[in-house]
Design a protein with these regions (language model features):
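C-terminal binding/interaction regions
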Residues: 1-54, 59-76, 82-158
Length: 158
């Protein structure tokens, strides 16, 4: 398998997707923010001074998905049909669990948009809680599934 983002001289290029037929594309990505017990309880009780951490992070994730081509150089600007983020508190692992779903009818996939959404949501959790905990860990940023396109479907086995 060859890398598609390099030209014959080995220089970076944006892949031409103009000849591809549009198809339904979906991607689901995840991320996790590991917290200490005190920070977890603050989020749970709504006691973080900057506001509702999970709601703000959800909105930030949507905004991040929409700005993906501004952040990832070879990522095509696409017309996203839907972005859905869910953030939940996992008491057992003392973490915020983030799932981002992105969909479109297009010529290229939405994996980067889903990954960016999950990442930006995680960064927002960190930003909103850094006054009370600086050693939070953002982890497990990963593609969980994708469908559509010439490379077919993918589902992570966890």
């Amino acid at each position: 398998m060859d890398f598609t983002h390099f030209n014959d001289q080995g220089r970076a290029k944006m892949v031409d997707v103009g000849e591809k037929d549009p198809s339904r594309r979906t991607a689901v990505a995840g991320a996790r923010v590991l917290l200490n017990r005190d920070t977890f309880r603050l989020i749970q009780s709504g006691g973080v001074k900057k506001g509702d951490v999970l709601t703000v992070a959800q909105i930030a994730g949507v905004m991040g998905a929409k700005r993906t081509p501004d952040l990832i150089p070879m990522c095509h600007p696409i017309l996203i049909d839907g972005i859905d983020l869910s953030l939940s508190l996992d008491e057992e692992h003392c973490s915020v669990e983030i799932i981002a779903r992105v969909s479109c009818d297009g010529r290229t996939g939405v994996e980067m948009e889903a990954l960016t959404a999950a990442s930006v949501a995680a960064l927002t959790v960190y930003d909103m809680c850094k006054a009370v905990q600086r050693d939070m860990v953002i982890s497990d940023i990963r593609l969980l599934s994708k469908s559509g396109g010439v490379h077919g479907d993918f589902v992570r086995q966890e």
